Amino acid sequence: MRTPGPLPVLLLLLAGAPAARPTPPTCYSRMRALSQEITRDFNLLQVSEPSEPCVRYLPRLYLDIHNYCVLDKLRDFVASPPCWKVAQVDSLKDKARKLYTIMNSFCRRDLVFLLDDCNALEYPIPVTTVLPDRQR
């Protein structure tokens, strides 16, 4: 009996399970995911520790990576006074620092700012979904 050559074995290996992420994340996708994660974590922190003074006085944190003011917002957030009692604040500041570094150095050429409205980061417009007439 003849043993199979290397070609069938190679084809079997290549036809195996596909990779979980076929393409690496881009600068834009990394910035977008990290900004959404930071905004979500900030909102959870506001709900879980609302009475803690250092949480209550943190700068508001709504991030829109298409708004030029987001860089100032991140810098202000990272520079806010330390919060020794709530470890999540330090974790959040580390993520904000990481996003600022990514936006300001690694991905600077990939950024396209569509807005320069700092008030939009303070008081974001809530996203509403309007259903088409047939789904009402």
Swiss-Prot record:
Pfam families: CYTL1 (PF15153). The keyword Phosphoprotein does not apply. The keyword tRNA-binding does not apply. It comes from the Eukaryota. Its main location: secreted. Residues 1-22 form the signal peptide. Specifically expressed in CD34+ hematopoietic cells. InterPro entries: CYTL1. GO terms for biological process: cartilage homeostasis; chondrocyte differentiation; chondroitin sulfate proteoglycan biosynthetic process; inner ear development; positive regulation of transcription by RNA polymerase II; signal transduction; transcription by RNA polymerase II. GO terms for cellular component: extracellular space. Keywords: Secreted, Signal. It is found in: Secreted. One of its GO terms (molecular function) is signaling receptor binding. PANTHER family: CYTOKINE-LIKE PROTEIN 1. This is Cytokine-like protein 1. It comes from Homo sapiens (Human). The gene is CYTL1.
